Amino acid sequence: MDNFILIISCIVAGMVFKTTKSIHPEAHKGINTWILYIALPSISFKYIPKIEWSLQILYPAASMVVLALGAYILMQYYSKLKNYSNRSTSTLQLASGYSNTSFIGFPLISAFYGEEYLSIAIICDQAMFLTLSTLGIITALQGGNNNTISAKFLLKRLFTFPPFIGCVTALVLSSFIDLSPAEPLFNKLSGTVAPLALFSIGLQLKFNGWKKLMSQISMSMVYKLLIGPALILVLGLALGLKESLVKITVFESAMPTLVMSSVIAEQFKLNTKLTNMIIGISIIVGFFTLGIWYKVLEWCF
């Protein structure tokens, strides 16, 4: 419950500050800079050293990639039918393929299934983060003004993107150095991601013209909250995997849109208005669809 109150409080606070002009209109850019350069890399240093590498992590890790690739393909096809621009296409792909696996996911996994299953949720979260830092950035780059992107340019942007650098550095250092003494620092820094990202969304959130965007919002949420998790469930059932592994992975994939999608969209000059609307509405609708998914998963197993 605390997390849900925090979600509402931070978004509303951002909207109030924007409406009353109590903050600089470009303040969200400074906030996003902190998130990208400090807070997000700290998440990698907090969780990656704790991952136990085994065959068991393949399904939850691969599922997050499948979820993102499914959104990429479906939104590419949908946008072509609707004759959307590259910018709109990339925005939809970014807003549809990445789940809020930690800030919303962790407390809901604990509430529905118990804290002992958070180990699976953490694998989902880190796989989602790694996918966002790679495929997500490639997707965002494709929505830029340049129709063609050279491999050299793409690799340069990818390898200079702070969260990606954080992931790679954490992977390498944790193999040689015990990072546990610095864990309290990483806990505090990573803890700033959710409230600041939500506050930033509130600063940018606009509902004027939502009717014109409803078809895009609806398509994004249908995939994010229904089709995507269904794909992951079918994959798990087809492979005959352990019940708890499939349940937690599917439930994580059914979470609302990742808040960080807004920060990436702003960084690469995509349609932040559409992204923020999808995030806000998916959080509300997602609470209902997650209840449905819980019942479906109980029935399946």
Residue map of PLM features:
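Alpha-helical transmembrane segments of multi-pass small-molecule/ion transporters
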Residues: 1-301
